């Protein structure tokens, strides 16, 4: 029963990737390993086999361990719906919307829930790799902390601090984090981990030695910048406006398929487009530009944590006009979950938006959507999962996937996330889209495996950790 906490100097320091790599590396050594994150704030989520909802990063980390997702891996999930409120998901079940202040009022109860989940995992696994949240150095939050030093204190965890050197100032980040926390928390810090290093490590070593001389804490690993990591990236990392997703590999034929993914302000499960991006000849770009929407061969309207708000944004930016012109021209559009709902005739949402009257959608599908307090959580055996409050109340459209979603000649809508990760389904879809988009020179690759690509990237991370972090020493130091 060994466990430790991987915290970060900042958000996006690379904690999730490091934990995924540790999970894979330790699992390859024959250990029974589980991931854990007490509290995650993310609109990227996954569904467990028993119908619970957790952060997608923890689902990936579980996959790295060879495990199916469990609510114990992420007992508290916050899904931001606005700048001030988030939906609170506790042990897989949505409990309502909370403000930052009201969330703090529940911290004692939530800390107990997190500790119970972690202790349950510690009883069942050889090693539990815990991930912190944001920065552990927010002293204004320490008294009610659930995920960082508060968890480490409650469960007696050693702590390793990850810093992103690619941003610059990593030594100051390490020093400041160490110095600002109190003595008891400081004593838990067992090592620093430099992440995303480029160049000659010997040039960095004098600085690391100076840091150790000042603080008495060693740097246990200098992890390299790994090019080409893109599958299952967290939140804003993978959906930057203008960014191309994935490798944009050369086409097998004479033409590419250009996919414009609309970067909604409250985009959720943005990872849905990654399966398309893994295909040779498919270029997926995040955009908010109406011209890009008009020119693309396929437009994807992804999920949203604020469907009505993001629909209003589409209209205010002119993107909705470009989408409607595509629909009139019968050029392919794919809506996923919230994106599908926006494509419908009417949306009645008293749950997430608090709207008292139905709102007109884009009207591409003759479908009415009504939001219900009870969230639909389904993990499909044949691929994909559903996470949504909105339900189809009326439809005259042909279903798309089984008896779900909607399909017209050139438009596709579904509540199902992850459907295109199924290789055969993705190939069929791309063949249809290339025909509709009049791209006869695009050739669908016959054997691309999204799962193989995911495993390849996890192994690359694990290999880097094995090479640059003494895992024998790490395991020996754990209690």
UniProtKB/Swiss-Prot annotation:
The active site is at residues 337, 417. PROSITE patterns: GATASE_COBBQ (PS51274). Keywords: Cobalamin biosynthesis, Glutamine amidotransferase. InterPro entries: Class_I_gatase-like (IPR029062), CobQ/CobB/MinD/ParA_Nub-bd_dom (IPR002586), CobQ_GATase1 (IPR033949), CobQ_N (IPR047045), CobQ_synth (IPR004459), GATase_3 (IPR011698), P-loop_NTPase (IPR027417). It comes from the Bacteria. Gene3D superfamilies: 3.40.50.880, P-loop containing nucleotide triphosphate hydrolases. This is Cobyric acid synthase. Pfam families: CbiA (PF01656), GATase_3 (PF07685). Belongs to the CobB/CobQ family. CobQ subfamily. Residues 256-425 form the GATase cobBQ-type domain. One of its GO terms (molecular function) is ABC-type vitamin B12 transporter activity. GO terms for biological process: cobalamin biosynthetic process. It comes from Corynebacterium diphtheriae (strain ATCC 700971 / NCTC 13129 / Biotype gravis). Catalyzes amidations at positions B, D, E, and G on adenosylcobyrinic A,C-diamide. NH(2) groups are provided by glutamine, and one molecule of ATP is hydrogenolyzed for each amidation. The keyword Hydrolase does not apply. Pathway: Cofactor biosynthesis; adenosylcobalamin biosynthesis. Transmembrane segments: none annotated. HAMAP family: CobQ. The gene is cobQ.
